[in-house]
């Protein structure tokens, strides 16, 4: 029995010491509060958010952090709970639905007489100076007319850490959704 005691103690100690270093944290972009329910009726305008695309460096599971002007780190333990492009599309549809009264906004095709929005996100990360970056461009097909608009948003984090970074990234993405909604509201 005494021979096994050191082996059992060593196993217990190694199990305790390794469990904390491999802990993973998963992040989901928060959805905005639900606004007015949209129902299709005569005269409703339809918007299909067809795609939100992201580059390869953002397409993995890890949250991305820029450590210098040319270097990026993809986190191993701070991960997206679901694919980032899906989260961006879901939150964009929710934000636009809230900000476009009289419109039905969906992530599925709505019919032949719909506007179509595609967004290409080129940056969605934290940066070494405490700023988050959300950048890219969107393309709207409005009644056969193509409208293309670049965006670049930088917002300073007020707190350190991945939790704060993800919250500020969501805030910046919501800010861009508001800008898209303003552009759509100005359409004839």
Where are these regions (language model features)?
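C-terminal motif of bacterial Sec signal peptides marking the signal peptidase cleavage site
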Residues: 12-15
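C-terminal/domain-edge helix-coil "capping" segments
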Residues: 17, 21-25, 34-36, 159-188
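N-terminal segment of the mature soluble domain
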Residues: 44-113
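Sec-dependent signal peptide recognition
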Residues: 2-7
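Surface-exposed short loop/turn segments
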Residues: 18-35, 99-144
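Soluble periplasmic/extracytoplasmic beta-strand elements of cell-envelope proteins
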Residues: 46-51, 64, 116-121, 133-137, ...
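Short secondary-structure boundary motifs at beta->alpha junctions and helix caps
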Residues: 71-79, 145-175
């Amino acid at each position: 029995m005494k021979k096994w005691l050191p082996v059992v103690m060593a196993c217990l100690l190694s199990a305790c010491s390794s469990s904390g270093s491999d802990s993973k944290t998963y992040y989901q972009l928060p959805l905005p509060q639900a606004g007015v329910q949209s129902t299709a009726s005569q005269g409703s305008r339809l918007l299909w958010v067809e795609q939100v695309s992201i580059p390869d460096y953002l397409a993995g599971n890890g949250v991305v952090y820029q450590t210098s002007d040319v270097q990026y780190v993809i986190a191993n333990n701070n991960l997206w709970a679901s694919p980032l492009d899906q989260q961006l599309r879901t939150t964009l549809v929710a934000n636009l639905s809230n900000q476009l009264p009289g419109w039905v906004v969906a992530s599925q095709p709505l019919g032949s007489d719909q506007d179509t929005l595609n967004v290409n996100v080129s940056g969605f990360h934290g940066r070494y100076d405490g700023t988050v970056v959300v950048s890219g461009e969107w393309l709207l097909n409005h009644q056969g007319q193509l409208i293309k608009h670049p965006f670049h948003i930088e917002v300073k984090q007020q707190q350190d850490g991945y939790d704060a970074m993800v919250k500020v990234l969501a805030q910046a993405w919501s800010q861009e959704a508001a800008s898209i909604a303003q552009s759509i509201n100005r359409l004839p």
